[in-house]
Structures are given as C-alpha cells and as structure tokens.
Amino acid sequence: MTQHFIVIGNPIAHSKSPEIHTLFGAHAGLDICYQCQYCPDDPASFTAVIEAFFHGGGVGANVTVPFKQVAYECCAARGGLSEHAKIAGAVNTLSLNQALLASGVSRAEALYGDNTDGQGLVNHMQRLGWPLNGARIAIIGAGGAARGVVLPLIEAGIEALTIANRTLSKATELVNELSTASVVIHNQQIQTCCTADLSGDFDIIVNATSIGLSGETLPLADELNCQYAYDMMYGRELPFLQHFAARGAQTSDGYGMLIGQAALSFECWTGHAIDVTQATAALEKSSI
C-alpha cells in the first residue's frame, strides 16, 4: 500500500523535498508518494489542509515557511509536541500520536509535532567541517526557522549567540522564551539586536529568513564579518551568500540541511534510518 506524505508551505514550488523523500523510499524499499502542497498564508487554511490530509489517510507532513509556528500551535492543542519542538516553539514534522489513535481520538485530533531542523543544520555543518564547539554565532531572523535551530546549536557547544531580527521585539521575545525554558550558553545571556545593527566579527552567520527567495537583500552592516556564512534557503542564487563570499567567507546554502532534517523526519515516520552521506551523493549524481 502506498504511504502518502506532503510538504506544506508558501512558496513551495521550489521544494526539493519530493525528490529527496522519493529517494529515501526507494532505498528503504517502501512505496511512497510525497508531494508539495501550496497553502494560502493564514492559520485557518493551514489547519484545513492538514486536517484533510491526515483524515484522508496521510502518514506524515513536513512544514516549511511560513507555517512552522502555526503547526506548533496546532499540535500543542492536540496530539502533543517533542521536547525540541516545545523549546523551539516551531514544528517542521507532523505525524500522528499512535497512543491517542489507539484510545479512539480522531486522526485530526492526534497531530504530533517535532522539529528536526536544528539537528539537520548541525549535522550538515559538521559534515562540512565547520567548527561549532566554541564558535561565536549570529542568527538573522527570529521566526520558526530560527527557533528550530537555536537549541541544537547550543547543544553542539557554541560559545556565544546573537539573534538579529528586523523587528527587535520579536528577537527579544524568542530569547525570553528560551530563558523561560532554561536554555543558556555557559550561563551567558543570548544577545539580540536589529538586523541593520548587527556588526562585528563572528565565526558563523546563519540567515534564517526567506528574504533571499525573492531576490531581496538584507540590510547588512559594512562592519559585519564572518568566516562561514550559511543560508537556510536553497535552490537559487542567494544574495546573502554572495555578499559574504565576496568578503572571503566559506558559504553554503541549506540543501544539505534539508537532506539532514528530511532523513530525521523519514525515520520518525517509517522507522527506517537513512545514510545521509550516501543519500546526498546519490542526489547530487541524479542532478548532474
């Protein structure tokens, strides 16, 4: 029997998730169908689409921008959340709480949320050989994408973290939530600032906004420098990476992170572990 999966987002046409998960399914010997699902940018539409998908027999769903926080709220009121999702306040992987289903709860009310983004990012940076232990890191953005990666980066041993956002209050809100959850870096306060005010030298700067997908540029200060620049988006030329490459930084888009978080989601849904290095090589070969 075919198992059905989706990735829901807006925009979504650029997503490579169907290609990745189809490869995973073939490697695991499973018959799967994984499709992109566009959704209007409002919570009611997201909820309606997800409920219809799972009610119709769907097995699992990935969530991308701009719905990760909406997905969190949906799961918090229904089937529950993993610890990483709770701390992040964002969900990128939806499945069904099997215990609740067994108790007679409807599929729509058994939605369970996890967040594999952060571990996918950390795993990719480690495969690239980027030093995380003791690193000084800045994250641009304070939405669902940023929320998902903060805790895994801290767990990887970073030394200091600055969260920059166009609206300072949103960055401050994220830090306050992390403080409430007792997330600290060596008992140091996580710093915040407006994106335009972010300056100084960092080991790694991560763009966790989707602004590059539209070809727009971030308001980056001339005094902002790094050794490594990472954009969580992928699939096209990204101004953020071009900016730091011109300054001599090593750069990477988020395709490797996508593969890593996808492997964790796939294992959550099917129980099959994926060799990410092998899968990445196969995907790169197929795209030549």
From Swiss-Prot:
Coiled-coil region: none
Cellular compartments per GO CC: cytosol
Protein origin, superkingdom: Bacteria
CDD domains the UniProt entry points to: NAD_bind_Shikimate_DH
Gene3D superfamilies: Leucine Dehydrogenase, chain A, domain 1 (3.40.50.10860), NAD(P)-binding Rossmann-like Domain (3.40.50.720)
Record keywords: Amino-acid biosynthesis, Aromatic amino acid biosynthesis, NADP, Oxidoreductase
Catalytic activity from the UniProt record: shikimate + NADP(+) = 3-dehydroshikimate + NADPH + H(+)
Pfam family, one: Shikimate_DH
Enzyme class (EC, first level): oxidoreductase
Enzyme Commission number(s): 1.1.1.25
Record: active site: K68
Gene Ontology biological process terms from the UniProt entry: amino acid biosynthetic process; aromatic amino acid family biosynthetic process; chorismate biosynthetic process; shikimate metabolic process
Record has Lyase as a keyword: no
UniProt key word S-adenosyl-L-methionine: no
PANTHER family in alphabetical order: BIFUNCTIONAL 3-DEHYDROQUINATE DEHYDRATASE_SHIKIMATE DEHYDROGENASE, CHLOROPLASTIC, SHIKIMATE DEHYDROGENASE
Family from the record: Belongs to the shikimate dehydrogenase family.
Subunit structure, as described in the record: Homodimer.
Protein name: Shikimate dehydrogenase (NADP(+))
Organism of provenance: Psychrobacter arcticus (strain DSM 17307 / VKM B-2377 / 273-4)
Gene this chain is encoded by: aroE
